């Protein structure tokens, strides 16, 4: 979805790819780490490495911890009920999806004319119309 409006993104869950990507980052890049618990070691390590390379770092989490400020430019907190990571009542990923949608909308609106034109180009490239 982001790529269709001209934002070059990559979703990475593999630890090895996270490590490889961390050496390819620079000040032109942004890294968004997502960890419901705020304790996912691979995500935190990747954010620290990205910060060292000059990338903008953003953490999406439910955990409020001042130590994140040492390597995160932005911390987006979302609310979850206790034990939701076990999926009993509502998926803990739901707030994350909402935040990603908000981010998408913000990026789209930041340069709407250009982003909509790029969206048209990508649809044409896919013969989606």
Predicted regions and their residues:
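Glycine-rich phosphate-binding loops that contact phosphosugars or nucleotide phosphates
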Residues: 1-98, 102-111
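A short, charged, Gly/Pro-tolerant segment at domain boundaries
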Residues: 113-129
């Amino acid at each position: 979805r982001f790529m269709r409006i001209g934002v070059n993104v990559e979703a990475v869950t593999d630890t090895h790819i996270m490590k490889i990507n961390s050496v390819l980052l620079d000040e032109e890049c942004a890294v968004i780490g997502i960890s419901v618990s705020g304790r996912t070691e691979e995500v935190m390590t990747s954010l620290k490495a990205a910060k060292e390379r000059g990338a903008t770092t953003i953490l999406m989490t439910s955990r409020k911890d001042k130590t994140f400020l040492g390597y995160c430019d932005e911390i987006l907190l979302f609310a979850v009920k206790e034990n939701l990571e076990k999926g009993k009542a509502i998926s803990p990923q739901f707030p994350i999806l909402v935040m990603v949608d908000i981010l998408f909308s913000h990026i789209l609106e930041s340069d709407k004319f250009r982003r909509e034109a790029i969206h048209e180009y990508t649809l044409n490239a896919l013969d989606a119309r």
